[in-house]
Amino acid sequence: MAKDSTGRMRVTVKSAGRMKLSSKLWLERQLNDPYVAQAKRDGYRSRAAYKLLEIDDKHHFLKPGASVVDLGAAPGGWSQIAAKRVGATEGKGKVVAIDLLEMPEIVGVTFAQLDFLSPAAPEKLLAMIGGRVDVVMSDMAANTTGHRKTDQLRIVGLVEDAAAFACDVLKPGGTFVAKVFQSGADATLMTQLKRDFASVKHLKPQASRKDSSERYVLALGFRGPETTNWSNPPD
């Protein structure tokens, strides 16, 4: 162990066998991340839970009795927070977690293994939850190629797809929150969201790593399905 610049003890990993440098650095970061350790103590499936906690503590959209959809939910950290905040663990609100991957059961959460990009997905969700929802959230990140511009476009494209899905299933007044990455590629996304929501802003929770370009977009006050047209973006 060694001390970092703040005086805290830092774990270093000695390379074992054929461990790649990138794997070694990732493991060191995990071992020295206070949010990773706290998530284990609190029983959350990922450190991302604290990002949603912070965003909701400031903006209060996960209200008791609300209905919530978590896109790309695995491993389930955001779904855990949503279930507690809306009362789904006590049979009050509703939380539906959607992912292509299987996800272990979470108390108060209904899991749907499906592709939200499927044309039939919005109708399946509406039938499952019994009507339009209050919140759609996404902590998804697109698979990267290593080519910066291509990756930026992929990331923004995924958020646009999530936003289009949200506009298909949200109630008027509803909320959309999603992970983005700081770049110049999201100008059209922000314009579209501002057309469809009363308030749109970028956020960077303290739980986001300081060296990451990760941000979250929070769109409040959905204007209603009649305003949306994600197949025809505004100029």
Curated annotation (Swiss-Prot):
Positions annotated as active site in the UniProt record: K179 (proton acceptor)
Record GO cellular component, one term: cytoplasm
Subcellular location as annotated: Cytoplasm
Gene3D superfamilies for the chain: Vaccinia Virus protein VP39
One annotated GO molecular function: rRNA (uridine-2'-O-)-methyltransferase activity
Keyword Transcription regulation listed: no
Alphabetical list of Pfam families matching this protein: FtsJ
SUPFAM superfamilies, A to Z: S-adenosyl-L-methionine-dependent methyltransferases
Keyword terms, alphabetized: Cytoplasm, Methyltransferase, rRNA processing, S-adenosyl-L-methionine, Transferase
Domain of life of the source: Bacteria
Reaction catalysed by this enzyme: uridine(2552) in 23S rRNA + S-adenosyl-L-methionine = 2'-O-methyluridine(2552) in 23S rRNA + S-adenosyl-L-homocysteine + H(+)
Binding-site residues, S-adenosyl-L-methionine: G76, W78, D99, D115, D139
EC number(s) per entry: 2.1.1.166
Keyword check for rRNA processing: yes
Assigned protein family: Belongs to the class I-like SAM-binding methyltransferase superfamily. RNA methyltransferase RlmE family.
Function: Specifically methylates the uridine in position 2552 of 23S rRNA at the 2'-O position of the ribose in the fully assembled 50S ribosomal subunit.
Matches recorded under HAMAP family: RNA_methyltr_E
Name assigned to this protein: Ribosomal RNA large subunit methyltransferase E
Native organism: Rhodopseudomonas palustris (strain BisA53)
Gene: rlmE
